[in-house]
């Protein structure tokens, strides 16, 4: 039987949530009460997602998941909501090359269900059906972010 204990003395990687919090929340219903009337078609909803991470110490990081949703009927805003939902994470024992994926994939993945519920509640409380945001592929978002940063670095490295 294989021994699952780490025998080389190195600590096994750990990821813990120390705190979760709403950093910023806003909901705008500029056309109320007219915007609450029945409509022929559903509004167009655009959702933007962003993740930021900042170190608090060698092992503790503040990760903020930002969700911005805007519903429009033609050129008129039906509702607009913004949420910055944060978590303080303790990240220890990971190799350095795994730190960014942990912070930008795993941490927001843990925050997302809570942020999604807040958005659903605030849109429902604003008089609309709850906005249930589809699951987000944070791995793909991170890969896209890395590719954009690499492309930017190549452009900046080209002499004029």
Swiss-Prot record:
Claim: Chaperone is one of the keywords in the record: yes
UniProt xrefs under Pfam families: SecB (PF02556)
Location of this chain's protein in the cell: Cytoplasm
Entries under InterPro entries matching the protein: SecB, SecB-like_sf
GO CC annotation, single: cytoplasm
Main location: cytoplasm
Keywords in alphabetical order: Chaperone, Cytoplasm, Protein transport, Translocation, Transport
The keyword Cytoplasm is annotated on this UniProt entry: yes
GO molecular function, one term: unfolded protein binding
Gene Ontology biological-process entries: protein folding; protein tetramerization; protein transport
Oligomeric and partner information: Homotetramer, a dimer of dimers. One homotetramer interacts with 1 SecA dimer.
Family: Belongs to the SecB family.
PANTHER family: PROTEIN-EXPORT PROTEIN SECB (PTHR36918:SF1), PTHR36918
Function per UniProt: One of the proteins required for the normal export of preproteins out of the cell cytoplasm. It is a molecular chaperone that binds to a subset of precursor proteins, maintaining them in a translocation-competent state. It also specifically binds to its receptor SecA.
Descriptive protein name: Protein-export protein SecB
Origin species: Rhizobium leguminosarum bv. trifolii (strain WSM2304)
Source lineage: Bacteria, Pseudomonadati, Pseudomonadota, Alphaproteobacteria, Hyphomicrobiales
């Amino acid at each position: 039987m294989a021994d699952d204990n780490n025998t080389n003395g190195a600590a096994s990687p750990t990821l813990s949530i120390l705190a979760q919090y709403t950093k910023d929340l806003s909901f705008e219903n500029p056309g109320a009460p007219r915007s609450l009337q029945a409509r022929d078609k559903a509004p167009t909803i655009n959702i933007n997602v962003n993740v930021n991470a900042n170190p608090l110490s060698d092992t503790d990081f503040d990760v903020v998941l930002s969700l911005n949703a805007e519903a429009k009927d033609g050129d008129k805003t039906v509702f607009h909501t913004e949420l910055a939902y944060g978590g303080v994470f303790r990240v220890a024992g990971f190799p350095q090359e795994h730190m960014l994926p942990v912070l930008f994939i795993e941490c927001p993945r843990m925050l997302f269900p809570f942020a999604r519920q807040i958005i659903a509640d605030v849109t429902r409380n604003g008089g609309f059906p709850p906005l249930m945001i589809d699951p987000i592929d944070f791995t793909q978002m991170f890969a896209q972010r890395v590719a954009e940063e690499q492309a930017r670095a190549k452009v900046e490295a080209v002499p004029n």
